[in-house]
């Protein structure tokens, strides 16, 4: 065998098949994955599986799942060349984003995938997604290094950087989009890798470092017409949080009213971390472009550049878990740590 891949099944639609007795969808035994997807036998890859018990509906995902995933990968890191994580689509972008920050010094592929239809139904997209994910997780270059040493999402013939993804559709097979970062690879007759976009480790023999301490004291405020000072204050100034993600209009704009800016200054003055993320799916925050954006900057709000809300949340969880000093966290927030923002 030229490579070995561990498939980790957390739950989700992809692992279901119809029970011939009553017609209901039930999870199948992933130790028999090659029987369910015989196309995998054509790869010279050793495939093992690990199944969560109980399985997790992705709507119920908590940080404890991310910690478990990181520990599973850490404990089996030397045994496998790559990892495929099967996950429900609803929160896959959150999980892929956060795991990208938790796994430092990554030199092997960690590929998330899932499906819109179960593997056990005729028109499933699950088989193609799984086959492509396994092939990418096992792929090596001419030097024997992993072709994609990143956390990524493989869906509908595209490989997308995990911390750049958003769920795009609840129904279409192309469920995920990466508006601000082109695909890392595209699967057609062959898999075409966009090697210039794929991040490479500084040292291929680097030791994997796993960050399992997460601080989840983060709130999210979506700026909207009609928002009242009372509502804003309850979110931004909540004493139980260390940070607040502000989802703003366009290039990072928001209200210019005095009460709005006063609340931001109050929160920032108390040490709260305030991060500006655009509500737009594509584009970037530029607080120097308009007066309303500049007023946020002067009030102590940091630019999230073109980070997604999912990645901003995971980045804050990890940075705050690593250090209790909010000034350090603010400094690190503005750095590109693993391809999550354009610099």
Residue ranges and their predicted role:
Residues 248-343:
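C-terminal non-catalytic interaction/assembly regions of soluble proteins
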Residues 85-108, 256-263, 292:
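Short Gly/Thr/Asp-enriched flexible loops that form oxyanion-binding sites at enzyme active sites
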Residues 12-15, 87-93, 158-160, 250-253, ...:
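Gly/Ser/Thr-rich loops at beta-strand to alpha-helix junctions
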Residues 112-189:
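Internal gly/pro-rich beta-alpha loop/helix module
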Residues 16-17, 91-96, 126-130, 253-256:
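Short glycine/serine/threonine-rich phosphate/pyrophosphate-binding segments
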Residues 1-75, 262:
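ATP/NTP phosphate-donor binding region
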Residues 2, 8-12, 30-41, 161-251, ...:
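Accessory alpha-helical/coil subdomains and C-terminal extensions
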Residues 8-10, 85-87, 111-114, 152-156, ...:
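Short beta-strand segments
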